[in-house]
A protein has these predicted regions:
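Class I S-adenosyl-L-methionine
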Residues: 63-73, 84, 88-262
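Conserved beta-strand termini and adjacent loop/short-helix elements that scaffold enzyme active sites
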Residues: 55, 151-153, 317
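Short connector loops/turns at beta-strand edges and beta->alpha or beta->beta junctions
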Residues: 82-84, 174, 286, 310-311
């Protein structure tokens, strides 16, 4: 008898990093919802059969979705609602007008009553206001009958070549969730992730210039022999001259002191460290440079750092693609969570 595939609804799905991790663990994502069409175009391009809906979750009625698309039963709801409205000014923060997107996630859980939910967010959501927000989130879901567990996970503990921390809340009906143990003893380094990708651009659909050099590269290339999204940025000669002064793993402090103020943010002129996992990939990619080449990472390099397989192709302008990658949950970390959930359900 075939093993049951648990069904998933992904809210605030973006391009689909969380969805991908759950699919890798054997879940079946039935629907994904977001209001950014660029990310949804990428989501649809990489998945046939998943309904990817452009809708404003702020005012979306779960019953409408259930009726319109025949979704009567959802096993797991996943997603990362934006929580920019969370502040620590008062005790009713969670009911603040600006936190309606978070409340919409709660509303969907209340309507569908899934076996489990997984919600991800920024790590400091646990400590803001001495834990007021964390406690309010736990209460919201406890009132719906869930036992809520939470933890800050480090992506590099799960084979992602990136030191990215995310707060994860998991709710189950009858037990606490046991978060996954580390899946790697030695972290995957930036060199492991990127060393087979060339300095210059590759036309979409061209062959890889070299064979994979390590296990991570073999895994990330699995099933594909063509490269996509590896277009290198053309920096000014002056930018190239300045970054050339910064060594592997260095930052602006490696420059002459009179050049420290050339860019206004403290992370400017930072190079990846080839011997370690990368720092957190952001949505702009304007200040972080390759450990060896005098340029910012390509979209494919950033996707590798996030643990997206090379078979996952990003659509849209370069700026949009970078934002899609930077906003995503690393699929390998999502897989570790999903795999653990699969065992428990």
């Amino acid at each position: 008898m075939a093993k049951k595939k648990y069904t998933v609804l992904d809210l605030f799905c973006g391009c689909g990093g969380l969805s991908l991790g759950f699919e890798m663990a054997g879940f079946e994502v039935e629907m994904a919802i977001d209001n950014w069409e660029d990310a949804l175009v990428t989501y649809r391009h990489n998945r046939e059969g998943v309904k990817a809906i452009n809708a404003d979750l702020l005012n979306l009625d779960p019953k409408e979705i259930a009726d319109q698309y025949g979704m009567s039963d959802v096993d797991v709801i996943i997603g990362g609602p934006p929580c920019q409205g969370f502040s620590v000014a008062g005790k009713r923060i969670i009911d603040d007008e600006r936190n309606k997107l978070y409340k919409s996630f709660v509303r969907f859980v209340e309507y569908f009553q899934p076996k489990a939910f997984v919600m991800e967010n920024v790590p400091n959501i646990l400590s803001m206001g001495d834990g007021i927000i964390r406690d309010a989130i736990i209460k919201d879901f406890s009132d719906l009958g869930y036992i809520v567990s939470y933890k800050v996970l480090m992506a590099s503990d799960y084979g992602v070549p990136q030191n990215r921390r995310r707060a994860i809340f998991v709710g189950l009906r009858d037990k606490a969730f046991a978060f996954p143990e580390k899946t790697v003893q030695e972290p995957v380094t930036t060199y492991d992730a990127l060393s087979d990708l060339p300095e210059s651009s590759i036309e979409d659909g061209d062959n890889y210039p070299v064979a994979p050099m390590c296990d991570y590269q073999r895994m990330i290339r699995q099933g594909v022999d063509k490269l996509y999204n590896h277009q290198a940025s053309a920096h000014t000669p002056e930018t190239q001259r300045i970054i050339a002064m910064v060594p592997d793993g260095g930052n602006y402090k490696c420059l002459p002191e009179d050049m420290w103020g050339l860019r206004k943010v403290h992370i400017a002129w930072t190079r990846m460290n080839s011997k370690r996992p990368c720092f957190t990939i952001d949505t702009g990619h304007r200040h972080h440079f390759h450990y060896k080449y005098n340029r910012v990472p390509t979209v494919r390099e950033a996707a590798r750092i996030q643990s997206f397989p090379d078979s996952f192709v990003f659509i849209g302008s370069r700026t949009s693609q970078n934002k899609q990658v930077g906003n995503a949950v690393p699929p390998y970390m999502a897989f570790a969570i999903a795999n653990q959930l699969q065992i428990i359900l």
